[in-house]
Each structure stands twice: as structure tokens, then as C-alpha cells.
């Protein structure tokens, strides 16, 4: 093919231009501005002229996605202000501007789903900030879980809290961590649905079922998956901050996934910042959080994991406190009271209030003496008062508990159970209460022995997150004013001295106030029997006098407690 020469526009007439254009078109050449480029090989005809222009004007060339070379005379908006570019693309794709501002790059590559493409089947979970539904994806036919995040308005604090879960989930990718599959948004309202894989069970629902009894190898299988998921979270700089049974989901294949990252946060151990201590459900809350620490790390998740391990082996929660004072008391009696150095180096806002008068001796090995011997060192480490002594998730996976026989079974080898979640246990208990109330209304005043088993044990409810305390208090006041509401009524934590109460949407089988104040569980061979020859024995449950739902003391002694009303609880 012959050479193509450039020409000066000033010396070329209109007729000559037309003639040149027609001749070049027939020879496969296209004119672009002042340059001619061949279609076949993209050779630039007037390179010399371009170089002169570049020297004169200082313009720079950039290569486009099509391979052409063009001059750029304006700053690239993508490079000068990438956040504006992303926001524009996201809004054009259908994302609400308030969500784009809050989540930034986390939305890149996604397209918002519409609510009418899902069909709700059943409500499967409820919390302080969200409801979870079983739903069908009408586009794929797949069963999914929809988590509806509730927030009253588009205040920056509310939106930031909601967006944090999305940002955290986009950081994580592990078989034992729930995966965010999509988002359902609305341009007209402050509603947002998070789309997850549907899971048939949660650990709290299975553990509370009277027909479920985990063997040692099954406990190892579940705990190995839990700690593996935590190891991944911590390696990605994520603290979960609410590890408990109802947040550990299990599918039909026995795979456990850590879920509900609503209280999770991103942390950097090399650049620490103050964080709220009002996290983690009370029964699984580490002592440093109860004492008001704002400088903490992975140890709070490992403490919760230790509580879960002991609970699976014992068949019930090991420290079911009702208030922060009582929870600390139970921790001191089981794990021992902190040393003097602990109080000196720790910056605790409540240290002076909750410091015990007399030191407590650590009694984990004595209390859990009937547990499998290989489990005791791991429980002892995870339930250390000093956060540093809890080590790491990686160290826990290398402990004797996982490297000794019987080894952990494979997830697929776990028994198959009918779908069971914490909310199912709550519904069963509510139905039992309704039947009791109906019998009482019909004049059935005869006292009946109440059969109590693991399905009727109390489950803790999460306390409010301090970062959204104003919104939570507002919901509580509205609930209290609505006489027709079926929700539990309770005072804000900062008004009741940190009492656990019964938060909105809490799942529990019986009111924790029915548990006598001085009750301390005893973990004997009846709690966990790992003999190969004998079947597991029945779990012991409390059958003593019931406490009054308000005063928390025995009904028989109700009249004698008026003089002690209002006295402050003190850790002895």
C-alpha cells in the first residue's frame, strides 16, 4: 500500500478536499480531523506534523480503548475526580444517591435489584435493627434470605451505620462467612434489603432443640468452621462484635457461616482508635467490654467463641447473666477476678464500680472437669481475663482440641435435622404461653408441674449499639406508648444502669428474670457425657421457685422484699 501524505488545510480548496476524500475512501483510508488513519493497520500518516503540534502546544497523546491515538486537551474527569465519576455511574445505574455517597466503591460492578423481583415466603429472624425473610428470587427461582435494614431517616449517622455492614461484607470471601449476593433498594423510601444465601438452621435453634445432642466430633466440626471464619475476618481487619448462636448459620450440607455483620467494624491493630463498648450480646461479652474498654481487638470475638464452645459441650449457656453487674459476677466466679496489673494498665470507665472486694479464684478446669480433656486447654485460653492470653484464631486451630482423636467430622457428615432457627423456638414458647393463658382463663387453677428442657431455656437479646443510641431510644419510647404493640417494653441501657432488659425484637424462650439471682450452673457429668458405651444423659435444668417477672424474687417472699427495693447491686 502506498504512502499517504498529510496536507495543509489552508492551501486546499473545497473541491480538492472532496476529490481527496473520495479517492482515499476507495483505497481504504479514513480521514480523522487533520490526520488520516488506515483501517487495515492503523498507521498514522502525519506523524511528523503531530510531533510539531505537540511541541508547540504541549499536548500529550493517550491511547483509547479502541487503539486509536488521540490528543487530549482537557483534564480527564475520571482521573481528576474519581469519586464523582463513580457516583455518577452508580446513580445512572439506579443506585440512590444517599447509598452511593455512603458506600462509594463498594457498589462498583453491581446493579440494584427491584423489590418486585422477590416474593417473601416467611419471616425467619428479627433484631433491633433488621428483619430477615425467607424469599424466592423470581428471576432465578432460587430461595434466598432478605435482610431488611430499618432506619428512620437519611441522617448521616443512620446511613453510615447501615452502609458499614455492606462495606465489611465486600471485604470478606470465605466458605465460613456469609456472602452478600446483592442489594434491593428504593429511590422513594429509606429501605434497603440485603440478599444472602438461604440457610436452613442457626446454631441457637439447633442447640435449643430437645432432639439435638452434639457429639464431640460434631462439636469439633462446628467450632473448626467458626474459628476458621473468624481467622479470615481478623486477617481482613474485621471485628464481628456479636458472635452468638443465632448469628451462626448452618446449611443442609453442614457448612457453618458467620452472619449478621451489623455491629462489625474495620480495625487496624497498628493504628488503633476508640470504639464503643456497647457491643456483643451480654452472655458472650468479654470482661473488658463490660468494664467500658474502648481499646480492644480480636480478643472480644475469641471470648465469644470460647463461650460457644463450652455451651455446645455443656448443652446450655455457661454464663446467663441478666445485667452487666451479674454478668461480671459470673465471669469472676468462673474465670477468676483480674489481677492488680490488669486494673492499672486497663483504661476502664467502669473499673472502680465493678472491681470485686475480694479476689476470686479461677475454676474453669474444676467446673468443666467432665468435658473432654483436650477441650480444657482451649476453653481455658479463650476465656482468659487478659485479652492477650486468648492468642489468635490461627493458634486456636492448632490446639490439641482439633489435633487429637476423635477428630472433627466433615460438615457433610453432620446429622440432618428439620429446619430450626432461634425464631422457631421463640414461636414454640409463645404458643405454650398462649395455651397456658387460655387454660387459666377457663378456670383451670390446678397447679401443674412444668416440664422444662433445653427448648425452654432463656436466650439472650442483644443490647443496643451506642453509636445509634438516639434512634434506639426513640423506638423504645414509641413502643412503650403504643398499648397495642406486642413488642417487649424496656428502658434504655443508660437509664437502667446497664440492665439487660428485653430489647425490641429479642428472641428468648423464657424471661431471664425468672432465673433466680443466685443460681450458678453446675456442669457435671449430666451436662456432657462423652462415654462411648453409655448414651448421653439428660441435661439438668432449673426447676426451683420462679421469680416474680418484675422484682425477680420468689413469689412467696414478695411481701418481704419491699424494704430492699431500690438497693444497688454490688459484686461481692
Curated annotation (Swiss-Prot):
Record: residues binding ATP: 124-132, 147
Catalytic activity: L-seryl-[protein] + ATP = O-phospho-L-seryl-[protein] + ADP + H(+); L-threonyl-[protein] + ATP = O-phospho-L-threonyl-[protein] + ADP + H(+)
Example of a GO MF term: ATP binding
Protein origin, superkingdom: Eukaryota
Record field: compositional bias (Polar residues): 74-83
Residues forming the catalytic site: 242
Disordered, as annotated region: 1-89, 409-474, 526-572
Residue stretches of biased makeup (Basic and acidic residues): 47-67, 419-434
UniProt-listed Pfam families: Pkinase (PF00069)
Top EC class for this record: transferase
Family to which this protein belongs: Belongs to the protein kinase superfamily. Ser/Thr protein kinase family.
Protein's recorded name: Probable serine/threonine-protein kinase At1g54610
Source organism of the structure: Arabidopsis thaliana (Mouse-ear cress)
Amino acid at each position: 500500500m502506498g504512502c499517504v501524505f498529510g496536507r495543509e488545510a489552508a492551501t486546499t480548496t473545497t473541491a480538492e478536499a472532496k476529490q481527496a476524500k473520495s479517492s482515499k475512501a476507495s483505497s481504504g483510508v479514513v480521514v480523522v480531523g487533520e490526520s488520516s488513519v488506515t483501517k487495515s493497520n492503523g498507521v498514522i500518516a502525519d506523524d511528523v506534523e503531530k510531533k510539531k503540534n505537540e511541541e508547540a502546544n504541549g499536548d500529550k497523546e493517550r491511547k483509547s480503548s479502541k487503539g486509536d491515538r488521540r490528543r487530549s486537551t482537557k483534564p480527564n474527569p475520571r482521573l481528576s475526580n474519581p469519586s464523582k465519576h463513580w457516583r455518577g455511574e452508580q446513580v445512572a445505574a439506579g443506585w440512590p444517591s444517599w447509598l452511593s455517597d455512603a458506600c462509594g466503591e463498594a457498589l462498583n460492578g453491581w446493579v440494584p435489584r427491584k423489590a418486585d423481583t422477590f416474593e417473601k415466603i416467611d419471616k425467619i429472624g428479627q433484631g433491633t435493627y433488621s428483619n430477615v425473610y425467607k424469599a424466592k428470587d423470581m428471576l432465578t427461582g432460587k430461595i434466598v434470605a432478605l435482610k431488611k435494614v430499618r432506619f428512620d431517616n437519611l441522617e448521616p449517622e443512620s446511613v453510615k451505620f447501615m452502609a458499614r455492614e455492606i462495606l465489611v461484607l465486600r471485604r470478606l470471601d470465605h466458605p465460613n462467612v456469609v456472602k452478600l449476593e446483592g442489594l434491593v433498594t428504593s429511590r422513594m423510601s429509606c429501605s434497603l434489603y440485603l440478599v444472602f444465601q438461604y440457610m436452613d438452621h442457626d446454631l441457637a435453634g439447633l442447640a435449643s432443640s430437645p432432639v439435638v445432642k452434639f457429639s464431640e466430633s460434631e462439636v469439633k466440626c462446628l467450632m473448626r468452621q467458626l474459628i476458621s471464619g473468624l481467622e479470615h475476618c481478623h486477617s481482613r481487619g474485621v471485628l464481628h462484635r456479636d458472635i452468638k448462636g443465632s448469628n451462626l448459620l448452618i446449611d443442609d450440607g453442614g457448612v457453618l457461616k458467620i452472619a449478621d455483620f451489623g455491629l462489625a467494624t474495620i480495625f487496624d491493630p497498628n493504628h488503633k482508635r476508640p470504639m464503643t463498648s456497647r457491643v456483643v450480646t451480654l452472655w458472650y461479652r468479654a470482661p473488658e467490654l463490660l468494664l467500658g474498654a474502648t481499646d480492644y481487638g480480636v480478643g472480644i470475638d475469641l471470648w465469644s467463641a470460647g463461650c460457644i464452645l463450652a455451651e455446645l459441650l455443656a448443652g446450655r449457656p455457661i454464663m446467663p447473666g441478666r445485667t452487666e453487674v451479674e454478668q461480671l459476677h459470673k465471669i469472676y466466679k468462673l474465670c477468676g477476678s483480674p489481677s492488680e496489673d490488669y486494673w492499672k494498665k486497663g483504661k476502664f470507665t467502669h473499673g472502680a464500680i465493678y472491681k470485686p472486694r475480694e479476689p476470686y479464684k479461677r475454676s474453669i478446669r474444676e467446673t468443666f472437669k467432665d468435658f473432654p480433656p483436650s477441650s480444657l486447654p482451649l476453653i481455658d485460653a479463650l476465656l482468659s481475663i487478659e485479652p492477650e492470653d486468648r492468642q489468635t484464631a490461627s493458634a486456636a486451630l492448632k490446639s490439641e482440641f482439633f489435633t487429637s482423636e476423635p477428630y472433627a467430622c466433615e460438615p457433610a457428615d453432620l446429622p440432618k435435622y428439620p429446619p430450626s432457627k432461634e425464631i422457631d423456638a421463640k414461636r414454640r414458647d409463645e404458643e405454650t404461653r398462649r395455651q397456658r393463658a387460655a387454660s387459666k382463663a377457663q378456670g383451670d387453677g390446678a397447679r401443674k408441674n412444668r416440664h422444662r428442657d433445653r427448648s425452654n431455656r432463656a436466650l439472650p437479646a442483644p443490647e443496643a449499639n451506642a453509636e445509634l443510641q438516639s434512634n434506639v431510644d426513640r423506638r423504645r419510647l414509641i413502643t412503650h406508648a403504643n398499648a397495642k404493640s406486642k413488642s417487649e417494653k424496656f428502658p434504655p441501657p443508660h437509664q437502667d444502669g446497664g440492665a439487660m432488659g428485653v430489647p425490641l425484637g429479642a428472641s428468648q424462650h423464657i424471661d431471664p428474670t425468672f432465673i433466680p439471682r443466685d443460681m450458678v450452673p453446675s456442669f457435671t457429668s449430666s451436662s456432657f457425657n462423652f462415654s462411648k458405651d453409655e448414651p448421653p444423659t439428660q441435661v439438668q435444668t432449673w426447676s426451683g421457685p420462679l421469680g416474680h417477672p418484675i422484682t425477680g424474687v420468689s413469689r412467696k417472699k414478695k411481701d418481704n422484699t419491699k424494704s430492699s427495693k431500690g438497693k444497688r447491686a454490688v459484686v461481692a
